[in-house]
């Protein structure tokens, strides 16, 4: 499984972001995640941001506010055309996700299907290998969900996209190939391996139910990101141990790309050192452990196979419960999904407080002499 090594870049200045992107591309990264604001989405800024980047061979992923999505697709497509890129080779994503706003802030976005269908049609003409819509299940993971919840609600989320986009006039093949799943990775090593294996199996069943013309449409495109829920301010270097095993889980389970969250993100803006360590954690697995040379090593393992079936059953049960409530959109609108995730978060925090869930360096072998107040970076509040 030769997964892509992705690093996220928060774009404050396009020239600085471009310099950073070109630098990290020489250090093992082959997938970039640009987080852009509306002011950055102009022909001039796009040219400056992607200057000297081989966009035919480097995966380019964008994150922006949903209101900027159409402008971003148009501007990116125009830039690729201006430099004569073979768009049948250029890959990436735009991560259009109106549900995230509903989940976080309760703001409804009723015409999401029409808007998404329009964006997909536009992107299909300009950048046919880019995926437009996303399922950001990583937010469930970071909020403290259990593994079965993250998977079950992610499947319901993906099914909501399939249903809405086919009703908006797209074929199931067109719709399925536009969805990218962004999962989190917790420290539960074998269960995370099983989760990704179960995800591919269940998603294939869901897409098959829509009767696609090509079996290739049942393939799940997955990006994995190490969890922020278990990252601590105290004894922060222990975060490296957690993120390393999390990355191993994702790599062994066959995801398409991985982002390792820098170990110091809980108390400061990650610097060059922590970002370099995060990159090297993946390079260690590829270049020294050769995890990219094997295919599904968990296959045939009694333990992993049984975990896969167990998680699949639990996740499928949650998927059906969500569908019974009217689908993912209605469940989010009613606050059902939020209530379930919040309840799990409260339960997990209580378990950590009682040492029923172990967090190394915090409730297990803590450093009692450490003080953290001095290293927390002050940030302006809105």
What are these regions (language model features)?
Residues 28, 84, 203, 253, ...:
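Conserved, mostly hydrophobic/aromatic
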Residues 196-202, 206, 224, 244-247, ...:
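Extended, hydrophobic alpha-helical segments in both membrane/secreted and soluble proteins
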Residues 1-26, 238, 242-246, 350-382:
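Non-catalytic terminal/interface segments that mediate subunit docking, oligomerization
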Residues 127-162, 244-318:
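Mobile "lid/hinge" segments at catalytic clefts and subdomain interfaces of large enzymes
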Residues 145-151, 186-198, 227-240, 268-278, ...:
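Short glycine/threonine-rich loop-to-helix capping motif typified by GTGT followed
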Residues 276-382:
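Catalytic-core signal marking the mid-to-C-terminal active-site face
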Residues 1-188, 219-223, 251, 257-261:
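Catalytic alpha/beta active-site cores
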């Amino acid at each position: 499984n030769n997964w892509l090594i992705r690093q996220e870049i928060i774009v404050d200045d396009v020239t600085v972001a471009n310099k950073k992107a070109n630098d990290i591309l020489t250090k093992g990264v082959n997938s970039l995640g640009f987080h852009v604001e509306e002011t950055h989405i102009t022909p001039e800024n796009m040219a400056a941001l992607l200057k000297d980047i081989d966009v035919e061979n480097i995966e380019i992923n964008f994150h922006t506010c949903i209101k900027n999505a159409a402008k971003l697709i148009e501007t990116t497509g125009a830039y690729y055309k201006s430099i004569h890129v073979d768009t049948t080779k250029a890959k990436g994503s735009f991560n259009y996700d109106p549900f995230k706003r509903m989940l976080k802030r309760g703001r409804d976005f009723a015409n999401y299907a029409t808007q998404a269908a329009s964006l997909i049609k536009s992107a299909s003409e300009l950048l046919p290998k880019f995926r437009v819509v996303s399922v950001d299940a990583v937010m469930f993971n970071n909020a403290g969900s259990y593994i079965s919840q993250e998977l079950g609600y992610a499947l319901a989320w993906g099914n909501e996209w399939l249903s809405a986009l086919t009703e908006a006039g797209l074929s199931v093949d067109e719709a399925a190939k536009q969805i990218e799943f962004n999962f989190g990775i917790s420290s539960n090593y074998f269960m995370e391996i099983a989760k990704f294996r179960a995800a591919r199996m269940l998603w294939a069943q869901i897409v098959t139910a829509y009767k696609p013309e090509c079996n290739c449409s049942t393939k799940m495109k997955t990006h994995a990101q190490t969890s922020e829920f278990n990252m601590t301010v105290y004894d922060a270097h222990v975060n490296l141990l957690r993120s390393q095993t999390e990355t191993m889980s994702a790599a062994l389970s066959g995801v398409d790309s991985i982002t390792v969250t820098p170990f110091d993100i809980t108390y400061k803006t990650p610097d060059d050192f922590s970002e370099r360590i995060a990159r090297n954690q993946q390079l260690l697995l590829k270049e020294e452990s050769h995890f990219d040379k094997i295919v599904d090593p968990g296959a045939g393992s009694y333990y992993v196979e049984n975990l896969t079936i167990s998680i699949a059953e639990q996740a499928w049960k949650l998927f059906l419960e969500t569908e019974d409530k009217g689908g993912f959109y209605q469940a989010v609108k009613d606050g059902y999904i939020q209530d379930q995730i919040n309840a799990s978060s409260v339960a997990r925090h209580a378990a950590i407080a009682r040492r029923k869930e172990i967090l190394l360096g915090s409730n297990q072998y803590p450093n009692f002499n450490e003080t953290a107040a001095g290293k927390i970076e002050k940030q302006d509040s809105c």
